[in-house]
Amino acid sequence: VGLPNKINNDILLDIIRQNKIPIISPLGLDKNNQTHNINGDTAAMAVAKSVKSRRLLLMTNVDGVLNKEKKLIDEISSSEILEMVKDETITEGMIPKINACLDAVNNGVTAAGIINGTKQHSCLWEIFSDKGSGTLIRK
């Protein structure tokens, strides 16, 4: 598994200027042209930072970040997230998503959302409604 260190913004922005949506595979090449798999959340975060996105959305099969009572947290700050990781409220598969979101919001992305990709219209609700559909993470 590799980590991204450079994103080719020119290609991405050219596709976006054509009113198309770029589809990005989380694969990367090293200096020896060896192919490496990159965690999809990490790749999405790197792209969001590189193109200076306002929002990063990561999808999962749960509604978002849950508190100790397993209730959805609508919005949370970076410091609150770190406390939840420390006290092990957030564990396992959510950790890479949380790390990607924190990296994004600490490096120029205004907010990051973790939403349930199995729910119909979750992206639209997250983007176009006041309440959203998952957890919004801000700096």
Model-derived segments and spans:
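C-terminal catalytic "cap/lid" subdomain
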Residues: V1-K139
